[in-house]
């Protein structure tokens, strides 16, 4: 795993079970100042990362860890769409330490959450390969914040969630409503899975 600020290699694991994002307090401070500055070019580039069906909805919020926030820093709720905002407004806010999307309220977007889908080198484990091959037409796939999981966003009607325990401590969860997904915008490319799907 690498420091989000300088790219230096850092270990996995930390206090209270959190995976560290920065190699030092200096890098943490630099990242904080960059977030506060919030340049328009950074916001524009992140908006362009997400596909139109996601970027166009008003289901976005800021985040402090895994806790959703409004753009003004007050708590946001999965059941209160008035606390959500368009993506460009969320990216222009400096509240918290990140951002994410709320699922539901007719947005037509769902998410497969694959926990522990990547090994320590960022390589897909076997069960995750099988799950990914079986997901039709993903909208967007990203690496999760702890860099050991994936978020696979798809178009979907709202329906009950599901959870499966997978080998090696993995989990495959599916949500389409009443759920906050903290996003990273770090694309995980699935080009190589096209041939695998066609061979089945």
Annotate each predicted stretch with a short phrase:
Residues 1-39:
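BZIP DNA-binding basic region
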Residues 20, 34-200:
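Conserved phosphate/metal-binding and DNA-contacting active-site motifs used
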């Amino acid at each position: 795993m690498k420091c989000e600020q300088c790219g230096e290699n850092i270990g996995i694991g930390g206090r209270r079970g959190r995976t560290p994002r920065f190699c030092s307090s200096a890098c943490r401070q630099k990242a904080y100042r960059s977030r506060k500055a919030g340049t328009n070019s950074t916001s524009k580039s992140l908006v362009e990362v997400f596909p139109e069906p996601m970027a166009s909805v008003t289901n976005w919020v800021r985040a402090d860890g895994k806790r959703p926030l409004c753009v003004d820093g007050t708590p946001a709720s999965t059941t209160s769409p008035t606390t959500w905002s368009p993506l460009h407004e969320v990216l222009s806010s400096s509240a918290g330490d990140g951002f994410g999307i709320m699922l539901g309220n007719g947005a037509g977007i769902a998410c497969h959450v694959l926990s522990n889908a990547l090994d320590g080198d960022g390589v897909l484990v076997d069960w995750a390969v099988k799950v990914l091959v079986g997901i039709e037409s993903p909208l967007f796939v990203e690496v999760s914040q702890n860099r050991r999981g994936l978020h696979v966003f798809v178009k979907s009607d709202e329906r009950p969630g599901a959870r499966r325990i997978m080998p090696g401590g993995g989990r495959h969860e599916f949500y389409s409503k009443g759920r906050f997904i903290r996003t990273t915008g770090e694309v995980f490319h699935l080009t190589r899975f096209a041939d695998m799907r066609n061979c089945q």
